[in-house]
């Protein structure tokens, strides 16, 4: 849709002839209907911009001010909301920690990753190792020296 400024419309006004069957009331009704639709659309999404700086103005927040009391001597004190009081040290009870006795079975992880099995050298629990016999090694060394 082409948009014109007011100056351009005033320049085009005398040159453009008005049609003889032009209905001004119907034209004004269409304009009013479009305005209503635009207002409804703006109201629909107005709650999203509640705290934004709309029209470059800061939002106004209501802050509760503390009450100021002045005594006979001229001293002013601020009365704020009462603080939540804690129990004294003697009244405090330490929370008791209960540890449940559980038995867990641990299986050796045979898979390094989920897609392929581990190498046989990596699995120590399944492969029995040969015990080293020191006496057998000493006997074999002595026999070689005697020859």
UniProtKB/Swiss-Prot annotation:
Subcellular location: Cytoplasm
GO MF annotations in UniProt: eukaryotic initiation factor 4E binding; translation initiation factor activity
Single biological process term from Gene Ontology: negative regulation of translation
Alphabetical keyword list: Cytoplasm, Initiation factor, Phosphoprotein, Protein biosynthesis, Protein synthesis inhibitor, Translation regulation
Pfam name, any one: CAF20
Superkingdom of source: Eukaryota
Basic residues bias spans: 48-66
Region (Disordered): 41-76
Protein role: Acts as an inhibitor of cap-dependent translation. Competes with eIF4G1 and EAP1 for binding to eIF4E and interferes with the formation of the eIF4F complex, inhibiting translation and stabilizing mRNA.
Protein name as annotated: Cap-associated protein CAF20
Species per Swiss-Prot/TrEMBL record: Kluyveromyces lactis (strain ATCC 8585 / CBS 2359 / DSM 70799 / NBRC 1267 / NRRL Y-1140 / WM37) (Yeast)
Gene name in the database record: CAF20
């Amino acid at each position: 849709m082409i948009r014109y400024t007011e100056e351009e419309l005033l320049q085009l006004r005398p040159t453009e002839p008005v049609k003889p069957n032009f209905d001004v009331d119907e034209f004004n009704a269409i304009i009013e209907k479009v305005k209503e639709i635009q207002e409804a659309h703006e109201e629909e999404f107005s709650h999203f911009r509640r705290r934004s700086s709309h029209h470059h103005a800061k939002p106004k927040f209501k802050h509760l001010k503390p009450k100021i009391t002045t005594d006979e001597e001229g001293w002013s004190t601020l009365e704020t909301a009462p603080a939540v009081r804690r129990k004294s040290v003697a009244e405090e009870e330490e929370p008791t920690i209960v540890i449940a006795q559980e038995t867990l079975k641990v299986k050796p992880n045979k898979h390094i990753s989920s897609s392929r099995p581990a190498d046989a050298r990596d699995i120590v629990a399944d492969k029995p190792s040969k015990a080293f016999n020191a006496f057998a090694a000493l006997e074999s060394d002595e026999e070689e020296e005697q020859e």
